[in-house]
């Protein structure tokens, strides 16, 4: 029977593709105030500024390719059931060939209505659509006439895919965490839902507090650490 692996990824897995991290020294939040460009308050205060920020992110992503870590994770699907749970809003896992990716914080290549289409549906997936790498501007309207906004979970908003992610971790035989400092909640608590018999591997070059004796820390960058993990599976 194929092993089921839940792969939780953060900004570190895309850093080697040239996409900046957020919280590290020199990261995006050193240049931009997240409360201005990535919070629900910032959106209502100055939506044009938020749209410009994500237009810039989309343009950069258009020129960015997945790295070996993304590709090795996708390759694991040949022998294992792989559930990728990513904190990243890029599409590099999909570009690499991963077929089951849960985006906890949304996707930069997608948009949805600013206002709910109705009280029951909220931002139902049927109202979310892919704009690829195109720009979105003030005045671009959704089908219900409201302003289009990035399909991003802003600071100050709930994480709607969290329950889905928890369910995937609970079913996993192995949990692999790549490129996240486990500082961003609620995602940082996901590994705690792993089964008692499920080993947990963390790939991160920085020191990581180990809260569980099942955790093995592979202290390497994503490409090198995922390669080591894959070798251990063989």
Predicted features and spans:
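Conserved catalytic core of sirtuin-type NAD+-dependent deacylases
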Residues: 1-234
């Amino acid at each position: 029977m194929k092993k089921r692996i839940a792969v939780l990824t953060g900004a570190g897995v895309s850093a080697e593709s040239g996409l900046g991290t957020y919280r590290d020294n020199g990261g995006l939040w050193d240049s931009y105030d997240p409360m201005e460009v990535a919070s629900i308050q910032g959106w209502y205060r100055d939506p044009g500024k938020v749209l410009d920020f994500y237009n810039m992110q989309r343009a950069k992503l258009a020129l960015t390719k997945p790295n070996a870590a993304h590709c090795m994770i996708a390759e694991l699907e040949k022998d294992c059931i792989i559930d990728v749970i990513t904190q990243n809003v890029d599409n590099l896992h999909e570009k690499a060939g991963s077929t089951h990716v849960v985006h906890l914080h949304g996707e930069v290549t997608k948009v949805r209505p600013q206002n709910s289409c109705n009280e029951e549906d909220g931002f139902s997936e049927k109202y979310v659509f892919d704009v690829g790498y195109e720009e979105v501007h003030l005045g671009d309207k959704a089908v219900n006439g409201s302003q289009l906004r990035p399909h991003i979970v802003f600071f100050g908003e709930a994480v709607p895919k969290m329950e889905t992610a928890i369910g995937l971790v609970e079913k996993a035989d192995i949990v692999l965490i790549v490129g996240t400092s486990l500082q961003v909640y609620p995602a940082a608590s996901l590994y705690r839902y792993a089964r008692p018999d499920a080993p947990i591997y963390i790939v991160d070059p920085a020191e990581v507090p180990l809260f569980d004796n099942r955790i093995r820390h592979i202290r390497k960058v994503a490409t090198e650490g995922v390669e080591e993990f894959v070798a251990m599976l063989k």
